[in-house]
Amino acid sequence: MPPQPPPAASASASAPDPAVPAWLRGLPRAPEYRPTESEFADPIAFLSRVEREAAAYGICKVIPPHPRPSRRFVFAHLNRSLVSSCDAPAPSPAAASDSSIPPSSSSPPPVSAAVFTTRHQELGNPRRGRPTPQVLKQVWQSGERYTLDQFESKSRAFSKTHLAGLHEPTALAVESLFWKASADRPIYIEYANDVPGSGFAAPVQLQRKKKQKRETAPMDEWEKSSGWRLSNSPWNLQAIARAPGSLTRFMPDDVPGVTSPMVYIGMLFSWFAWHVEDHDLHSLNFLHTGAPKTWYAVPGDRAVELEEVIRVHGYGGNTDRIASLAVLGEKTTLMSPEVLIDNGVPCCRLVQYPGEFVVTFPRAYHVGFSHGFNCGEAANFATPQWLKFAKEAAVRRAVMNYLPMLSHQQLLYLLAVSFISRNPRELLSGIRTSRLRDRKKEDRELLVKQEFLQDMISENELICSFLGKKSVDNVVLWEPDLLPSLTALHPCSSCSKAPEKKGEDGPRIGSTQSSSKDDSSSDGTACMTGTQSKGLSMDSKQAPEGEKLDTDDGDDLPFDLSIDSGSLTCVACGILGYPFMAILQPSRKALEEISLVDKERYKLSCEKEICSNVLPCSPNDGSSGCPLIANRSSSPVENANLSHQDVKPIRSDISLMGKEFNGTLGKHIGTSCSCSSENTIHPYGDTETPEKKIPSDCPGSELSKQSGRGDVNVPDVEGSEETISWNTGCAFARPRIFCLQHALEIEELLASKGGVHALIICHADYVKLKALAISIAEEIEFQFDYKDVALANASKSNLHLINISIDDEGYEEEGTDWTSRMGLNLKHSSKIRKETPESQEQPPLSFWGLFSKPSPISVVSNLKWLCRKARTPYKVIGYASSPDVVATPDKVKPAVTKTQIDTSGNAHENIGSEQTLQQDCVLQESNDVADMCKRPKVNDQDGHSLINIPIAVAEYPMMHQVCERPVSVSACDDPICSFDSQDSPTTVAVSAGKPTREQCGAESTELSTVKQFLDNGLIAEGGSMNFISNHEHLESDNATSVCKDEQLQVQQDQLAMVLCNNPNTELVAGELHGGAASSTLENEDSCGNTSYCSDTVLKNSEPDTDDQPETCDRSVVLVTPKSSCDQMISSSDRSCSLTLDCPVSTDAAFSSEKLSMAHDLMGSELQAVHNSKAEVVASLTDVKGAKLNSIHTTQLPHESPSSDFIISEGAQSASTTAIPRKNGTSMHTESNSIDILLGVLADESKVSSGKDEVGKASLTLMTLAGNDQSADDVTQDEVAEITDPSHGFCSSDIVSRSIGSSNRTNIICYARRKHKRKSGSEFNINSPQSLGSFVRSPCESLRPRTRPAIVEDMTNETKTAEASTANKRKKAKVEAFQCDIEFCDMTFETKAELRAHQRNICTDESCGKRFSSHKYLKRHQCVHRDERPFKCPWDGCPMTFKWLWAQTEHIRVHTGERPYKCSAPDCGQSFRYVSDYSRHRKKFNHY
């Protein structure tokens, strides 16, 4: 408890009234209503009518037609309600001897006097000692107990002190003083809130209902008084929650503050914090007597904005939204409405005087304070409009870790059927009353009935959707009374003790009267025995019409419907569901996948549970396994493993899906006569059949043993249906309860992981409710589209399953089950988000949308991080001619992938995959060109055949009009490359060198191939990454053609690219040089008798400068067998690359240099294709900053002199591929989509001589279309950045595109701004939202621009170049700066921190305190550290302390020393702590 400062000095009598701030004077006033006598007779109908207008303010005032009750009336009935508690404490001596209380009231009160406790409230901001936020006020129990007269006397004395300067204080003047005091030095006020009781007299109707005798003598004086008339009206807060038409009428239990009122006794400046009501209910507040009370409110539709303003401006903005909701729920946040108004949040004010009601509406935040001593009362109710907020309110309450109090569905159902009249004549259509009151009542009831029928239809649709799944086939009926233990089903289905009603200022304080509900019961849906449940229901036939009360209590539930705790909590959203719920448990396969990380813990847990839940079987069972439940007489409570057979035609509810495990399941683990915690499975049929055992050597048997799941038997498939085994022994696999909506989502989520076991349960009253719903639909002429669902009574095993699915009392989510592991547990997920706000992983279900964002976000803002703020400007720097292609607008059509495969007579397979969310267009060749391209399949002498692979050149994903051609790829005879070998290793064939014009016609000398090297450090699941370096000349053995040149010269410092197409091959070549650059494409028009149409040679001109080092050319073809590719696609990391070693021959000789390749770690997607038995994968590898490991080279024998050219990429070029295939088979792929993307990337160059030099960069991105390649796979691109070690610059985006002119293609160069500041969106490329069907910007797949990584130059073949990858930045070594002051050994990262430290300033960001001595600064560091150097010297005491004075005070606990004694005469009190002594002197003025 913080020390109390002395009371504020009395203001001068001549002090002027405080100036009213402009924001306060301009606040709009909430509406007020004055109902007539007839309107006042039905509060729910009246409030439902005014709610349309008043809800826009969030609050309103209702002035009753009766005068306010007298002070004597209120005090008499309030004292009576307070002393009704048997454990009412006596008033404290301190309160009785308070110097501020007059002598007449300081005498000890009688034993029977009503007393109550209070709380201390802080008002003001401390100047020091407490960091922000200062909107959170301290509230603690005072420990004092007062009678009403004592507290009134103390309050008047306090008001006289603080309002002495105001002659006649107005409401605005007091409000100005309050908000001024909230910013000044703290003062402490007392407030008695959440005191159970009422100032109303018990209504006569309630007394008759309870068969109580009226008290004639004491009540004669109150008869016909204003208080008596108001108490016997429907506005009595003791009956408002149970008023006809209120949805809270049928809440099972009496919850103080909700269904029964609570009293609030305040003094001047007693405040209540910003808050909303529990479950966002309506509240009705009545001020009995005393000073006014001011309210401020924000409408419900602006609640999210208020929460965000408080989070940012009140809590500093560093708090997670869920955590800020929890802090708001503590009801200690006091923020001026001025902050809200400045941030655009509307707010209104209202002044409540004695005898007036104040109504708050759902989701409306409100705050307020008292102008002096007063006594108020509050309770909750709900109009039909509350149903719009009920669901989200329940979820929000669960996120704040509060137990639910009610089920909105159950309350809706019971209220709707309560409107059914007992008189059958009123069910006939056409009979309408002419009374205005009755017509309004019918309108109110019509809304509830429509909501009821609509909810019935929605639940029916969910049931029908669920029954269409394979995981569930029927619905069972259950009742809470039928569970194995009546204490198993706890209130609110969470089986934990109900939370006490939280009042305006936080948790409920101890009061003089205990809660009206039993401590063993819970809140809104507390568990009730069958007798209690039936006692609350009312038989319509037994209620005579003469006993029908004025409060319409005769409209109770018909058909013996009972109010019980049949609602269960959904694990995923925290809502109490009714009447349908689903019990889910993942299948064994799904559980093993979910628990992959914690697999060992899962096994041990299962085995432990099995050992602990083994039950003996009867000796005469005659089987080693668990017998059928039909042969057992044990009770369901003692069974940990149950089986059953339901009545036909319903299938067995507990069964084992044999298909799920391919019919191979484990046998019983135990061979003795015992059963495990698993359910024993038996066949379904009219007669019992013996269980079918599975041999121990089957695969499933071993799996069963490993996973700890025994007693699993496969039923006879021919004579019985499949059954499901529920794992009831493993804590990780425990069945959990979900609402139907989230159960469907989870079922779909687990469908791909192995499936889920499901059981739908329905409350037994649903059968009656359905019959009543049909009658209501006929009455209001509502189209009731309902599909009948087969229902069956729950068996004993069903009841046992329900019982173990319900949480035990006090159950806490510790994250040990499958729901927490998958992020499906709302409480656990919110707990994790509170503990680790930086980890904001989005759960897979939809309910987190309520809390993940402060306000609804549009689609555009959702995509903000997916693209750059503005598209990078570009300019056309040249064009490439292509005489073979003529692009016309009428030949542009959307791209649809079509793959045609011809392998030795195999059937052709055409598969079309539509490209979604992209504007892809391809250009069709003209007719004459198409004729030229038609070539027969040519098989070489060695059996090689061609595979026509289409190639497209375009910028991705900016798909413009592009030109695409087929590429001839031949098969390979190398057994390593064989597609028929499923286990063949994979290597890469690389042609790297620096071609020259003289080498074009030269004879090939020798073939050099490379040996694969597998880097285990970069292996993804199911795939491998091979790094190969080739340092030999790769020359063609068969040069039969003469190159024909077509040269394109571009200006210096710019990109030079040449694009030339021939009938079967499309080549894209790009060159980048710092100096004069030129690019020459040499292509052969006439084809020889080779297996490829043309040979391509890229010539690179040397730069003018001699000191510029040579750059190496790199190119890669990646091919993988089908089996390996399957593993890659199924892998979670699909960005792995597989390679294949194939022989290479070409007409050009290339000199090779260093080759560095690395796996692209930036989340690019692997592009895969299945071609019949083979799968070809093209994946680009990152060569920038790669770590190379042990690169070796070998030579493989040259298979054929006519081997096909595979790939050749110059130092700054991109080229095409030719892949041979074995056995003379051919594979032709024709596509109208963009299947192979080639782009050349170059980053901005560092200026060395006043000019921007574009550095060496080259990229080949190839995707081979396949017959089962999905559209999404095609859209994912592989990107790499290449760094020239000789230049200090990175490559940027330079993409060559074929754009739709008739015979030329523009070459576009992107100009990057220098030193462009990186936005936060550039670092979110790996976000899960970036995957999927979102549209990416052109440079979305690029890594964030970082400083260039340095790649070491390799001088020999075996040297490994070590460099960091682009996204792993090299961290600069942090220099430590040490303090040189004597006896100080602290070090700092920066000199600024060191200088501040030497000036005796704390360097902690949240502190910044200044000290007079360095010694004090060093001692202060304990505040920010976990060091506790001082230990208690007492033997056996483990206490440690940060401060010496704390150790000294603690020692007094052991010694009993009380060194501080009061010096006032006749006091003599002694104190252990100086704070207690100081507080005592200030309180009693003992100086």
UniProtKB/Swiss-Prot annotation:
Enzyme class, first EC level, given as a word: oxidoreductase
Start and end residues of each stretch annotated as Disordered: 1-23, 86-113, 494-555, 684-718
Keywords: Chromatin regulator, Dioxygenase, Flowering, Iron, Metal-binding, Nucleus, Oxidoreductase, Repeat, Transcription, Transcription regulation, Zinc, Zinc-finger
Keyword Repeat: yes
Binding site for Fe cation: 275, 277, 366
Entry-linked InterPro entries: JmjC_dom (IPR003347), JmjN (IPR003349), Znf_C2H2_sf (IPR036236), Znf_C2H2_type (IPR013087)
Predominant location category: nucleus
Zn finger intervals (C2H2-type): 1377-1400, 1400-1424, 1430-1454, 1460-1486
Gene3D superfamilies (UniProt xref): Classic Zinc Finger, Cupin
Keyword Transcription regulation: yes
Positions of the JmjC domain: 232-398
Null mutant phenotype: Early flowering.
PROSITE patterns to which the protein is assigned, alphabetical: JMJC (PS51184), JMJN (PS51183), ZINC_FINGER_C2H2_1 (PS00028), ZINC_FINGER_C2H2_2 (PS50157)
GO BP annotations listed: chromatin remodeling; flower development; negative regulation of gene expression, epigenetic; negative regulation of long-day photoperiodism, flowering; regulation of gene expression
Compositionally biased spans, kind Low complexity: 9-22, 86-104
Cell location: Nucleus
Annotated cofactor note: Binds 1 Fe(2+) ion per subunit.
Gene Ontology CC: chromatin; nucleus
One example GO MF annotation: histone H3K4me/H3K4me2/H3K4me3 demethylase activity
Enzyme Commission number(s): 1.14.11.-
Record's function text: Histone demethylase that demethylates 'Lys-4' (H3K4me) of histone H3. Involved in the control of flowering time. Has a suppressive effect on floral transition under long day conditions through the demethylation of H3K4me3 in the promoter region of the flower-promoting signal HD3B/RFT1.
Classification via PANTHER family: LYSINE-SPECIFIC DEMETHYLASE (PTHR10694), LYSINE-SPECIFIC DEMETHYLASE ELF6 (PTHR10694:SF45)
Protein known as: Probable lysine-specific demethylase SE14
